[in-house]
Amino acid sequence: MKKRVLSVVLALIMVFAFSVTLTGCGGGDDAGYKVGFICLHDENSTYDKNFLDAANAACEELGVTAVIKTNIPEGQECYDAAAELVDAGCDIIFANSFGHEDFMIQAAKDFPEVEFCHSTGTKAHTEGLDNYHNAFASIYEGRYLAGVAAGMKLNEMIEAGDITASEAKMGYVGAFTYAEVVSGYTSFYLGAKSVCPSVTMDVSFTGSWYDEALEKEAATKLIKGGCVLISQHADSMGAPTACENANVPNVSYNGSTQEACPNTFIVSSRIDWAPYYVYAITAAQNDEAIDADWTGTLETGSVVLTDVNTDVAAKGTVEKLEDVMAKLKAGDVEVFDAKTFTVDGKALSSYKADVDTDAAYEKDTEVIEDGAFKESKFRSAPYFDLQIDGINLLDTKF
């Protein structure tokens, strides 16, 4: 335990950098039960706002108290935040960014009486800690659906004579060239291709999860390069704003941007983390085991779409999305069906992915089954890292 004087000094310093919110939810017998949340940014980031909304919704539903720390970097600050939440009496603590993982693992080792849950992480299934857990959702299904909406918009533009079939090029703003992002933009592209076979896509990376200027710059570059529709896996309003300014259709992520971008927003997919939070908090309250690796799905309500902006989307988009969603739920459509894409001109019949995330990034697990790449089957976090034909990377950022 740090000496009190040092703790006070650190607190005075940290208050300028980090934000802490204590939210009392409900007034039941569980109101004294505290749940900690660690977020990389604050509500100005669409990614973090999505987590914060889910945290508050889950705690409200369960009648427990949320203690929220925002603007926590992917470094020692995460461990410090976790330790402070333990000191504050939190019995279960969640963190929301990929780079938080090693610090959450260390906290789990140091505080074995507290449950630690990390969204987007990859190591829980190999760490073997009873109180450390990973969670993700099959968001590739949501991005595939969003891609279908994008492909329908491209078809509308082709039919109207605004572009030719060969000009049906989308742009995608990514944060990093990680499997999580690769899986997302590939599923989005395959969704579009399922209805617009001539589509191609350029991808540009910013090297940051949240940098509005860089995201806007990347989207503008893609538009100037001939991309007629833009999507993204980055967390600010940079790309949607660039699209609205240029009157280029946009498929956003982590929430609707229709209010700010009414003339270009089509639809958005997102993970609803509330089902996982409710599950994990309830298990912790009841002293029940929490899955080491939990994957939410369309069926659990963890993968959702916003309302479609029918003023911008192609006619029939809502009905088409309902049809494809039903087929995804029934297993009649596989997002990564190997018949629908090639790699270097060749069909894929076998592939080993790096599922266990060792230091050497060794490919350890066969992931092609029944003619499809089985994303999220062998761990919750994405491991699709193939560069398929039709997608052109303008740069890379690791």
Please describe what each predicted stretch is.
Residues L10-F18:
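Hydrophobic helical h-region of N-terminal Sec-dependent signal peptides
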Residues T21-G24:
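C-terminal motif of bacterial Sec signal peptides marking the signal peptidase cleavage site
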Residues G28-F398:
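A residue-level marker of the well-folded mature domains of exported/periplasmic proteins
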